[in-house]
Amino acid sequence: MELKTIEFIKEHEENWRELLKDIPYCLTINENDNYAIFKYSQTGSDFNEQICKECRGLIIDKNILKPIALSFYKFFNYGEQFADKIYWKDCKVQEKVDGSKMLVWYDAYENKWQISTSSQLNAYEAKVQDFNITFGQLFDKALINNNLTNNDFYNLLDKKFCYTFELVSPESRVVIPYKQADLYFIGVRNIETFEECNTLDFMDICNKIKTPKQYPLNNLKACLHATECMGYDEEGFVVVDSRFNRVKIKSPAYVSAHHLKNNSTVNQSRILNIIENGEQEEFLTYFPEYKEYFVTIEDKLVEYKNNLKLAIEDINFKMEHNDPCLPWTRKDFAKYINQTYPQYSSMLFKYMNMDLINLFIDNQWSKLSKEDKMKKLGLKYEQEEE
């Protein structure tokens, strides 16, 4: 079956570039003399359109209008509108590697293997942000770290297939820190049939390059529970079934870390949430670059709580020493609080309205077992029938 993208180009030979760059597709297109690579926009592309799902680094030969390379179609987090339906009886739950997708494919015009990113045909021209290095150079470093030369690596490959790898490195870090440049073998596609293949059928590569860890999980509930137990050094899972349907299941900790920066601005509310959950020590183990932000916000939190405590002590003192000859009314206390402690007024009003002794008693009583409650009341405890 022909790709929708190819069909569209054939139907709009004169202006396919302009149309595909415009809504509803909003594709980025990069070209050289023979090839074009297509990448969707995460925010602009309409994923109701199959074309947008296909264009996740799709490479076509412009001369013959044939797809030359593609890793996976766009896939989504479970629960999202466009997420694939997974056949759980026959699926694999794999580690979600937190890296950059790299596509390796054979160039028949140049008679050599090429390495592309998801948006650039030549990975050696794709600069890593904030570093004087390209993704192609990082790929080479990763091969060296796996004791492979480029020739050794290319000798493992078959021209009838295109191959997908996940590249991780300190320089190209997304969220999770990796100590050195490395590769994970994550996908293969037959370019003659354009059907996806099982990576485990390519053991020559699997024996030389890492593959994602696999987990003995076979349902959504088990996967969700497992992600809740993950730390900040794991992204989550990719679930792929025998039909190559895929969904992502990300850990809450990873999502929190990933969204810690919004448009290069640190999200202070997320830092506060991590502090309140008591997870700052674990978080800073993996992301020490955020320490000064945590110190600042934690100091502000401690200061706020200490000042609130002093305000409560002041109100308690005034309530206990209220002059019986000229007593303060609730209105007088409200006026004093609003004038003296405007930042804490809502909490102080709630405090004054609380019956703290009974609140404490009720809280502790609710924690007792039925047997303990009966004993404390001097009553006989009888086991209830199920």
Predicted features along the sequence, with ranges:
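Core nucleotide-handling region used for phosphoryl-transfer chemistry
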Residues: M1-E386
